[in-house]
Amino acid sequence: MATVQEKAAALNLSALHSPAHRPPGFSVAQKPFGATYVWSSIINTLQTQVEVKKRRHRLKRHNDCFVGSEAVDVIFSHLIQNKYFGDVDIPRAKVVRVCQALMDYKVFEAVPTKVFGKDKKPTFEDSSCSLYRFTTIPNQDSQLGKENKLYSPARYADALFKSSDIRSASLEDLWENLSLKPANSPHVNISATLSPQVINEVWQEETIGRLLQLVDLPLLDSLLKQQEAVPKIPQPKRQSTMVNSSNYLDRGILKAYSDSQEDEWLSAAIDCLEYLPDQMVVEISRSFPEQPDRTDLVKELLFDAIGRYYSSREPLLNHLSDVHNGIAELLVNGKTEIALEATQLLLKLLDFQNREEFRRLLYFMAVAANPSEFKLQKESDNRMVVKRIFSKAIVDNKNLSKGKTDLLVLFLMDHQKDVFKIPGTLHKIVSVKLMAIQNGRDPNRDAGYIYCQRIDQRDYSNNTEKTTKDELLNLLKTLDEDSKLSAKEKKKLLGQFYKCHPDIFIEHFGD
């Protein structure tokens, strides 16, 4: 069966969307062609850029699926980069509504589409745990009439406007309902595709730049070393030609057992076993209880094995140790939203394999920590047991106190569905820079400033004088209102202040 990418390539969509194929006087705002073009472009981008692979969902494995949050990331980046709506800010929530529209019109479907045997109206979820699959239709052009193929983007968009159900509320109306109106510019620049290496380097650079905005770092050495590292393009796993049949059989038996149990806990645990060495997997398989219905014994066996493995290996977040402290400090100060974005940026810098392994482990930790799940230890809360056993598998930073480490680990567990999303701010920065590179402009000029803003000498002098004066007034006010100082100490300190800054003193107290 051909992959999504192969089928999209067979449609020659890059030529279809090239400037040579646009009609004279083309404008995105034209009806209905303009919206048809936009939707066709969105569908093409989603089909060719979202990662489609075999995934597990609701205790079963499904082929050719993609994650909801990644679909939002792809469409979000595409809309901003191509500026169909000018320079208007596009909230992530509105991109979710675009995905909902695509699912309503059968561009893709949820996996599965039924819950407990009943039809349920599909609702798109911006989550790393929600899976979707592109829909297929009978190939009417085939003489056999038995083959299936994906809708082409052009056929999808055309069908959206021809459907009688949509005439009353066309996709143009959807844009307006989203408070997004297509730009009237007749020049919508769909430039040549950049190389994956260039795109990865831009993502790396801007992720680090955005991280520096959010986290106060005493030293930049770790970030600079991270920036010097060449971003690796995810490569498919190489299958060994010589597979140990015994190990392969043991892993297959464990997966089959998990699929037969319909238990989220077991499903998450078995997914983690993929990263355990063969010897440990064989030991687990051979140590299975004789009574297959004793899931409590199975869970105890799996939890002990996974905990033992991760307690003896390097932590998954062993990079950018200075950032750990910065995120923990944000959490201590109650800045949860900023801490979440900083965490998303930190995880974006992980390589593909470590990121996927960490996602599976964090998901298992969140499920196992649920108080309604299998009791891990009789006298301890599940949440505390998971935190104690897996903390060092995530962060082992000597410069981070135990309290801050615990706070960071619990925060990751509580937000495991959100920490792997890409922040909208980063999306916009990267898209603007990639667009500038595509158009041959200076990317640093168009992408705005990240670290500082250049000002002239006059503004610098004025800002320096004003800031110094404001801080001196704050200091004087603090001294005057400090009730802990004795009258003698206060008089002495105020006298010293008057000698150094008489103008500030008189301005505050008067003559």
From Swiss-Prot:
Name this polypeptide is given: DEP domain-containing protein 7
Annotated GO biological process: intracellular signal transduction
Family label: Belongs to the DEPDC7 family.
Entry-linked PROSITE patterns: DEP
SMART domains per UniProt: DEP
Source species: Homo sapiens (Human)
Span of domain DEP: 46-136
Tissue: Expressed in liver.
